[in-house]
Amino acid sequence: GKAIAAKIKELVETGALKFFDDLRAEFPADILELFSLPGLGAKKIKALHEKLQVSSIAQLHEACVAGRVAELPGFGKTTQEKLCRAIDERQKYAGSFQYGQIAAEAERLQDDLRAHSEALHVCIAGSYRRRKEIVRDLDFIVATSAPAEISAMFVQHPLVESVIAQGPTKSSVRLRSGIQCDLRVVSAAEYPFALNYFTGSKEHNVEVRSRALKRGWTLNEYRLGEARPDSAAKQKKAAQKIPVIRDEVELYRALDLDYIPPELRENAGEFEAAANEKLPRLIEAENLRGTFHCHTTASDGRNSLEEMAAAALELGLQYLGIADHSRSSIQARGLDEARLRVQLAMIRKLNEGFENFRLFAGVECDILRDGSLDFPDAVLAELDYVVASVHSAFTLSEADMTRRIVRAMQNPHVTMLGHPTGRLLLRRDPYAVDIPAIIDAAAETGTWIEINAAPKRLDLDWRWWPLAKEKGVKCVINPDAHGIERLQELWFGVGVARKGWLTKADVMNCLPLGKIEAALGKKRSVNRDR
């Protein structure tokens, strides 16, 4: 209408909107934070603000501790206790960020630093480079002969919210997201050592330095040199000649190791593998040929079948699996049998118009409390695949939850297990479940296990994948996409797979269209005979 058109015109012409500024001025700046706490909606926040003058999480915590929240109508002691626990959980995670929360800022800043005419080499180090699921800060290493110019550009970058410190070789800022970001400026000769050291992990670095010392060398964040006489004397061999080191490949080679990818640098077997030429060739993002576990407007997605297919084609994928929620997920507008069959028919019809691309018809089927599935076998048999997931009763004991999930995996129509631990990073801990038992069940039943690539999940965690791989369990990387823009989050799942030592042979959706069709057909045929 005219009112909205006028507001759009004002935004375009002035870059601001008086209506929005006036609206924002009516409320305290921190009050919107209250919406991030579970159980608090607009009505309860309004009551807290009007009755108790609560306008921030800190003030709410004070009111809870004083017992005043429990006295409000519609709250009570139980709600007060839940809010206290939620605030305590939030404090526990203060200063931590999901990898996906800060990836856009990190990559943009890295790109802009690399574009600087005086930057010779630029790389993000730290836990971000190692693809840890939780990141506390960002470390940028830049090789340059003009440190002052690089530092000035860094602290003046548009993403910088505030400058913490600025010096000739190190500067620290806080970005708009709230994460602290450190810049270390080094020479080209120092760069490989600084990059390796600040990438970590601490445990990895200790072993790297130990291996250097055994050769009569000392290694730090700036150089490789001869060890002090007292240190070298402990090593029974004379110091070896120090090689020229121009990059990390040459650094590891000097230690008689294959290059160790950053994702594996946790001192969890990578040195033994690198010394014996047994490091895996890790999966790359370009190895993916398609994906499953995507939602549409039929349930709680934001885009139609046609739009999701078009987005997948634009990304160069050969196939896309549609897995809208099943009927028990009422909060997600889960499909009943009739609506599921309508969608199945739509997918079959759309596939008639594709060349070298296919939509697979599936469902994200709720695993009910007793381990049964949300649809009868006759319905599931009509689909191309089934994602089985837990969406309720998270507080079962470990034994009961494990039995529940294993029973679901034993259903012959289940293709893959979705987000196996139910965790929401920095928000909800995994439910109690025996993951080794789940992996054993997957190996026995041939069930694929998902890496849910949504940044808030990254589940199954990378720490479990070496065991799963050892047992012969196959992985499938899924974005759990509820919109076309979320398909690109597959990249986050690839990071988890790499950190879990997986190759493209371990990941089912690295198969091209013809082979994944055959694999799905074979799996259903084998399972029917179980």
Can you annotate each of these PLM segments?
Residues 131-217, 221-296, 302-322, 327-357, ...:
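Charged catalytic cores and adjacent phosphate/nucleic-acid-binding surfaces used
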Residues 2-171, 178, 192-193, 206, ...:
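Accessory alpha-helical DNA-binding modules that contact the DNA backbone or grooves
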Residues 99, 297-298:
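Short acidic-aromatic active-site loops that bind/stabilize oxyanions
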